[in-house]
Amino acid sequence: MPYNFCLPSLSCRTSCSSRPCVPPSCHSCTLPGACNIPANVSNCNWFCEGSFNGSEKETMQFLNDRLASYLEKVRQLERDNAELENLIRERSQQQEPLLCPSYQSYFKTIEELQQKILCTKSENARLVVQIDNAKLAADDFRTKYQTELSLRQLVESDINGLRRILDELTLCKSDLEAQVESLKEELLCLKSNHEQEVNTLRCQLGDRLNVEVDAAPTVDLNRVLNETRSQYEALVETNRREVEQWFTTQTEELNKQVVSSSEQLQSYQAEIIELRRTVNALEIELQAQHNLRDSLENTLTESEARYSSQLSQVQSLITNVESQLAEIRSDLERQNQEYQVLLDVRARLECEINTYRSLLESEDCNLPSNPCATTNACSKPIGPCLSNPCTSCVPPAPCTPCAPRPRCGPCNSFVR
């Protein structure tokens, strides 16, 4: 609590009617602290006989009382200063926990959350990489599937072409079989016609006479027919064997191609089924990864929102603590300023006390018994007093006595 001190100014001018007129240089001197001491206790050194009267005794008593009050006030100020120091010390001790709050738990929590966020981010990145790899694998499988599908279509087109060739060969075989049957029927017809002609000729020859003539040997028709038949049969057999051999060869080749194509088709079908299963599994896994990513993103968003709110609360707490710290610092600065003001007041009071002490010590000097031997302020001897002091101290202007004034008293008092 600040103390405002107003140093009193003592206007202690006594009436000059109680003593002889003094020269103009013997007026009252102003002391430090704005207190005017009467001329009879001043440092003018113009003392006449009987100058230390009752008013001056009252002034000295008043000064002693003021000195005692100053000393008491100094002690009171020292006690107040000690109380203020104790109060400041207690306040500082009470505010110490607020000055340095412990945020280690918050820091640990923040570090753990940061580690979790980093782990979540790394897991999210790993899942993204896995998803990208799965997409690339799916693209590869899709490309392979398209390739195998094109190969399958080519094989199916080849199989269809071979089937058409097989149908053509079957038709050709049926045509050849029909030709063989027609040739067999024609051969039978020729045989029957030949037998009929032979029988007819035999009948005709049997009715005739046997006339032997010398002529060229006749042609054996049976032999010729047999040779012709054997030639045709050999030709037909050769053609048949060639056709059968060609048909067998083509059939075997077609069978081999069909078997290989069927095997390839089965392998392709198995591979296609396996690829479909893989694609389905990858799609399911991709959907699961998408769901996991969405859940992780939601969890991350919730964690960020929750920890941002906690961080804002911690920040507000830090702001409040900083504001309290600023208030405490301002209070400490204000109390320090008040303490400095009190120290200044104490120093001024000590200076005034020293001044009053020097004045009191100067007043303790022995007063001269012979007023005519009194020296002035310049330590020069003063001539003997005349019977009429007013005539000896006549200034250039006529001397007019001072108007009577009331007894001096303190002008101001301490204001707290």
UniProtKB/Swiss-Prot annotation:
Region of interest (Tail), residue spans: 364-416
Region (Coil 1A): 57-91
One matching Pfam family: Filament
Organ and tissue specificity: Present in scalp but not in hairless skin. Abundantly expressed in the differentiating cortex of growing (anagen) hair. Expression is restricted to the keratinocytes of the hair cortex and is absent from inner root sheath and medulla.
Claim: rRNA-binding is one of the keywords in the record: no
One example of a Gene Ontology biological process annotation: epidermis development
Family of the protein in this entry: Belongs to the intermediate filament family.
The name this protein goes by in its record: Keratin, type I cuticular Ha1
Organism: Homo sapiens (Human)
